[in-house]
Design a protein with these regions (language model features):
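ATPase catalytic-site recognition across NTP-hydrolyzing enzymes
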Residues: 3, 27, 79-154
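Conserved RecA-like ASCE ATPase "motif II neighborhood" in helicase/translocase motors
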Residues: 1-35
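Mg2+-dependent endonuclease catalytic cores in nucleic-acid-processing enzymes, primarily RNase H-like
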Residues: 53, 171-298
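Short, flexible loop/turn motifs enriched in small residues
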Residues: 145, 158-164, 174
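Residues immediately C-terminal
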Residues: 19-22, 157, 214
Length: 311
């Protein structure tokens, strides 16, 4: 991207763009687009085999729904002379059904062994936020009388993982996402202020912070420095695990929840159940992208190599 900045180009051709790592693709595209957007006859041509639900997928779906100005062209294998059902059968026998669907049927397939069923992920439709600013995407403005919950994950702000939180409307079932924050540069010292401001705007939302690593620092700042009252606590019950609430259910109480193997296993199971039974509606692109690469590794689920699972 640094080689392109400051240049002037009439046409930029991006080949197999879907195979560029997501973080690199987003940075590159944000650098490239301004170099050609000022001309009247300039063009961006993107050609690629589908490869999961990444930036190429987002550009394609936005074009299908007339949310951007790209013209899409889909070249199916059946349009190539000499390719018939016999060729299809032989190709699948020499490769695999999944590879054929991606390479020749032009299907956007996520990774294998994902937590959420791939067929369910494929039905998730994302929408553009009504307002975006400095990492915060808002899909719905606060409604009077509605109940909101903010769930936050804290990173160190070193460009690797993202500090993130999601605002859920839990007033009625199905639950829905009304706002999302995601930033890989925000420092833990400043993150509590952002959580505080957004939670306060959403009717003094209940806030649950993951307190592994430096998350405890953020939860402590919310409780004692910013004096935010609606912070969800967890009571430690030994082998019985952790019980979230106001911290009055017995046992040693802590601010937020600490993710252990047992907590993660239960959380993944519950998340899978409420999404696949349509009790939680997902309409955020970044979250859908993370679900498409959140896979089983050993006895637990985590992001595929080169991807993130902060949301």
């Amino acid at each position: 991207s640094s080689a392109v900045r400051g240049g002037s180009y009439n046409m930029i051709f991006l080949d197999e763009f879907a195979f560029v790592p997501t973080n690199v693709a987003e940075d590159f595209f944000s650098s490239v687009y301004p170099t050609i957007s000022s001309g009247k006859s300039t063009k961006v041509i993107i050609v690629s085999t589908p490869n999961g639900m990444n930036l190429f997928y987002k550009l394609w779906v936005d074009a299908e729904n007339k949310r951007n100005s790209y013209n899409i062209i889909d070249v199916h294998w059946s349009q190539v002379p000499g390719r018939d059902e016999k060729w299809r059968t032989e190709t699948i026998a020499n490769t695999s059904e999944e590879q054929f669907r991606r390479e020749f049927d032009c299907e956007f397939l996520g990774s294998a062994n994902t937590l959420i069923n791939p067929s369910k992920i494929k039905t998730m439709a994302f929408y553009n936020p009504i307002q975006s600013n400095a990492g915060l995407d808002m899909y719905e403005k606060p409604r009077e009388g509605a109940t909101y919950v903010v769930v936050a994950d804290v990173a160190r702000g070193t460009n690797n993982d993202y500090s993130a939180f999601i605002v859920f409307d839990v007033s009625t079932v199905p639950y829905k996402i009304v706002a999302k924050y995601r930033n890989n540069e925000i420092k833990p010292l400043l993150f509590p202020n952002i959580i505080h401001d957004v939670a306060k705007a959403y009717n003094q939302a209940y806030v649950l912070v993951e307190v592994n690593d430096i998350g405890e620092q953020v939860a402590t700042a919310l409780q004692f420095d910013l004096e935010y009252e609606n912070l969800i606590m967890a009571s430690m019950r030994g082998r019985a695990g952790q019980i979230v609430g106001g911290g009055f259910s017995g046992g040693k109480a802590q601010l937020g929840v600490r993710t252990t193997k047992a907590v993660k296993k239960l959380g993944c199971s519950n998340l899978k159940q409420i999404i696949e039974t349509d009790k939680l509606i997902i309409t955020d692109y970044d979250l859908i992208n993370e679900f498409s690469t959140f896979i089983l590794k050993g006895q637990s689920f985590e992001a595929e190599e080169g991807h993130t699972d902060d949301l």
